[in-house]
Amino acid sequence: MKIIMLGAPGAGKGTQAKQIAAKYSIPHISTGDIFRANIKNGTELGKKAKTYMDQGALVPDELTCDLVMDRIQQDDCKNGFVLDGFPRTIPQAKALDDALTKIGEKMDYAIDVDVPDENIVNRMGGRRACLNCGATYHIVFNPTKVEGKCDACGADTVLRDDDKPETVQKRLAVYHEQTQPLIEYYDKQGILKSVDGTKPMDEVFSAIVGILGE
């Protein structure tokens, strides 16, 4: 079972991807993890990626796809995998499809965790992070016991720059321009499934399990 998770930043697709991976005993694969692992292990692909990342540049699609293909051809992916954070653009999706076709494979599902922009801004604007230990909270869904203080270490919690409304709006604009076209792309392939991401996390997961089967 080969699955791609789609959805805007803050839609909760990463959380759902982890739960899918645990339930179906398949790896949860994020591009960030792949980059870090290859750089840490000093692979040739990792060295190439690091030269771009050190300059603050985006890693080219072709190299990112090579890294992903290298990962999904490892033994633990024989029964499937969940891709989280890749592909992000139509060129990446086409590169992935082409690479999979060469090894006689194809994606089975593209699951879109659908959340309106307004909900995303409110959801991310409520996030708080501990300045000291990095623990994360939410003022509505997962508040600290003492307002503004971390439950774990007692240090101050703050709204990160990444979660400020103006930053979230910019990230959403990029998503709508670059990533949302993937919804139509996978719909045309007949593998797109959409779930209502505004519902509680366990209900969203139940809906996904309903699509994938027990």
UniProtKB/Swiss-Prot annotation:
Superkingdom per UniProt: Bacteria
GO molecular function: adenylate kinase activity; ATP binding; zinc ion binding
Any Gene Ontology biological process: AMP salvage
UniProt binding sites for AMP: T31, R36, A57, L58, V59, G85, F86, P87, R88, Q92, R160, R171
Annotated disulfide bonds: none
Annotated positions binding ATP: G10, A11, G12, K13, G14, T15, R127, T136, Y137, K199
GO cellular component annotations of the record: cytoplasm
E.C. no: 2.7.4.3
Main location: cytoplasm
Entry-linked InterPro entries: Adenyl_kin_sub (IPR006259), Adenylat/UMP-CMP_kin (IPR000850), Adenylat_kinase_CS (IPR033690), Adenylate_kinase_lid-dom (IPR007862), P-loop_NTPase (IPR027417)
Catalyzed reactions: AMP + ATP = 2 ADP
Pfam families given in the database record: ADK, ADK_lid
Subcellular location: Cytoplasm
Function: Catalyzes the reversible transfer of the terminal phosphate group between ATP and AMP. Plays an important role in cellular energy homeostasis and in adenine nucleotide metabolism.
Protein family membership: Belongs to the adenylate kinase family.
Entry text on domains: Consists of three domains, a large central CORE domain and two small peripheral domains, NMPbind and LID, which undergo movements during catalysis. The LID domain closes over the site of phosphoryl transfer upon ATP binding. Assembling and dissambling the active center during each catalytic cycle provides an effective means to prevent ATP hydrolysis. Some bacteria have evolved a zinc-coordinating structure that stabilizes the LID domain.
HAMAP family (alphabetical): Adenylate_kinase_Adk
Record's subunit section: Monomer.
Name listed for the protein in its UniProt record: Adenylate kinase
Species assigned in the record: Agathobacter rectalis (strain ATCC 33656 / DSM 3377 / JCM 17463 / KCTC 5835 / VPI 0990)
